[in-house]
Amino acid sequence: MQKAGLLLRGWTRAWKSVRMASSGLTRQNPLANKVALVTASTDGIGLAIARRLAEDGAHVVISSRKQQNVDRAVATLQGEGLSVTGVVCHVGKAEDREKLVNMALKLHQGIDILVSNAAVNPFFGNLMDVTEEVWNKVLSINVTASAMMIKAVVPAMEKRGGGSVVIVSSVAGFVLFPSLGPYNVSKTALLGLTKNFAAELAPKNIRVNCLAPGLIKTHFSSVLWKEKAREEMIKETMQIRRLGKPEDCVGIVSFLCSEDASYINGETVVVGGGTPSRL
């Protein structure tokens, strides 16, 4: 009886290995043969995410507003042996969003993953001093463009039988960053966008989840840490011991895009080093 049980367990493990291999999936390559679009992915968190998705087996299309940045990032990642291409894309422009989607379809005949990472923050100061122009710019890029980007990829994902979207918000959506009012508001809006799209797209087998990074040391966040005194004040306020690195954010994104997260939808995961992060 014991011998039969051992044989059965061995057969089960072998069958699981065959099943994973037949689908092109392995624990080393959980995103094998998937096609991923990552916006704002030539630097910082976006670049780190693009690298990790490619390392995990995906074909990644990166994008940014400037051609030289796209060229540099593509050369770097291809030099690491990763399957990466790139295109200029200003997510606030409909024609650029269409160009990004069309490149993925032309090169890889489908789209499985979208990481919506693009954001702007043109203002630092008191909320009462924010102009209408600034409000429109922040909400247009940080919120509306994310919604339009998701809308653009859904038809392609449907043809593949489903897909996964990760919206990059921020811990600022829960706990305000000082003097970044419009940015904070836009990131809170993305939490709601995640919930609404998750519910609406679930019947299409498209999952929508959200990453909320804490204070990550990138060029984008440098206004909060480039002065040592300000960095220490921010760390104390956020109750963290150190600033995060872009690489701290990548594992959870790859997981959310994988089959291991097939029963996770509409959730926001905070990667914030312990920053209090609930509304």
Swiss-Prot record:
A motif (Peroxisomal targeting signal) lies at residues 277-279. NADP(+) binds at residues 37-61, 187. It is an enzyme of class 1 (oxidoreductase). It is found in: Peroxisome. Its main location: other. The modification N6-succinyllysine is found at residues 93, 217, 228, 235. It catalyses: a secondary alcohol + NADP(+) = a ketone + NADPH + H(+); 3alpha-hydroxy-5beta-pregnan-20-one + NADP(+) = 5beta-pregnan-3,20-dione + NADPH + H(+); 5beta-dihydrotestosterone + NADPH + H(+) = 5beta-androstane-3alpha,17beta-diol + NADP(+); all-trans-retinol + NADP(+) = all-trans-retinal + NADPH + H(+). The active site is at 183 (proton acceptor). Keywords: Acetylation, NADP, Oxidoreductase, Peroxisome, Phosphoprotein. GO terms for molecular function: 3-beta-hydroxysteroid 3-dehydrogenase (NADP+) activity; alcohol dehydrogenase [NAD(P)+] activity; all-trans-retinol dehydrogenase (NADP+) activity; carbonyl reductase (NADPH) activity; identical protein binding; oxidoreductase activity, acting on NAD(P)H, quinone or similar compound as acceptor; retinal dehydrogenase activity. The modification Phosphoserine is found at residue 221. The record marks 177, 180 as: Responsible for the stereoselective reduction of 3-ketosteroids into 3alpha-hydroxysteroids and benzil into S-benzoin. One of its GO terms (cellular component) is mitochondrion. InterPro entries: NAD(P)-bd_dom_sf, Sc_DH/Rdtase_CS, SDR_fam. NADPH-dependent oxidoreductase which catalyzes the reduction of a variety of compounds bearing carbonyl groups including ketosteroids, alpha-dicarbonyl compounds, aldehydes, aromatic ketones and quinones. Reduces all-trans-retinal and 9-cis retinal. Reduces 3-ketosteroids and benzil into 3alpha-hydroxysteroids and S-benzoin, respectively, in contrast to the stereoselectivity of primates DHRS4s which produce 3beta-hydroxysteroids and R-benzoin. In the reverse reaction, catalyzes the NADP-dependent oxidation of 3alpha-hydroxysteroids and alcohol, but with much lower efficiency. The C-terminus peroxisomal targeting signal tripeptide is important for peroxisomal import. Once in the peroxisome, it is involved in intersubunit interactions. Three specific residues, Phe-177, Leu-180 and Asn-196 are conserved between non-primate mammals whereas the respective residues are serine, phenylalanine and threonine in primates. The two residues at positions 177 and 180 are molecular determinants responsible for the stereoselective reduction of 3-ketosteroids and benzil. The presence of an asparagine at position 196 is important for the maintenance of the quaternary structure resulting in stability at cold temperature and improved catalytic activity toward retinal. Belongs to the short-chain dehydrogenases/reductases (SDR) family. This is Dehydrogenase/reductase SDR family member 4. It comes from Rattus norvegicus (Rat).
